[in-house]
């Protein structure tokens, strides 16, 4: 499923570049740490999102806070800590919507991503902010709308 990408903002928190080897190394170390600590970070349950790079075509894995949405679906927020730009994984999903996987509690599955808009987004946003108030702070840091994606188990082709 494809979606229209939310544009970048003009202001926001500074975000590290994922393009350099050091940042990718730190990302891999963080994933190992999170796995050992029960897939949690700062009080948030995590999932591991795997996408295919929009430019490189290589698989990329990113730990993200997960919010249950029923029927085995999860919500994730493309916040990048309130950066002016959308995270790389968001662009990867837009470029390769049929190549998205998650790992939750040791179970891996292929998913479809749906960007929420309008009332469904607002309802989801309120649930997310009630659960993790830090996301309201991320939104205040930037003038872009933080995309919320629903990741649902993919139907077999």
List each language-model region with its residue ranges:
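A generic structural motif
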Residues: 50-54, 103, 152
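A generic structural micro-feature
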Residues: 41, 56-58, 94, 143
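A broad, low-specificity signal marking well-ordered, structured residues that form hydrophobic/aromatic
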Residues: 47, 74, 100, 111, ...
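Short strand-connecting beta-turns/loops that link adjacent beta-strands
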Residues: 69-72, 107, 156
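Alpha-helical membrane-targeting segments
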Residues: 2-45, 140
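Short, active-site-adjacent segments that bind or coordinate small-molecule cofactors and metal centers
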Residues: 135-157
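Short, structured beta-strand-loop surface elements
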Residues: 80-134, 141-145
């Amino acid at each position: 499923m494809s979606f229209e990408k939310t544009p970048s903002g003009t202001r926001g928190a500074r975000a590290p570049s994922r393009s350099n080897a050091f940042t990718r190394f730190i990302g891999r170390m963080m994933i190992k740490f999170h796995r050992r600590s029960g897939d949690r970070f700062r009080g948030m349950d995590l999932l591991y999102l795997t996408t295919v790079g929009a430019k490189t075509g290589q698989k990329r894995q990113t730990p993200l806070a997960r919010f249950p949405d029923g029927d085995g679906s999860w919500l994730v927020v493309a916040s990048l800590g309130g950066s002016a730009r959308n995270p790389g994984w968001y662009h990867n999903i837009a470029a390769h919507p049929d190549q998205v996987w998650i790992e939750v509690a040791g179970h891996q599955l292929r998913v479809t991503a749906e960007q929420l808009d309008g009332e469904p987004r607002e309802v989801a946003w309120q649930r997310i902010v009630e659960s993790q108030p830090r996301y309201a702070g991320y939104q205040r840091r930037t003038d872009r709308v933080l995309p919320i994606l629903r990741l649902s188990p993919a139907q077999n082709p």
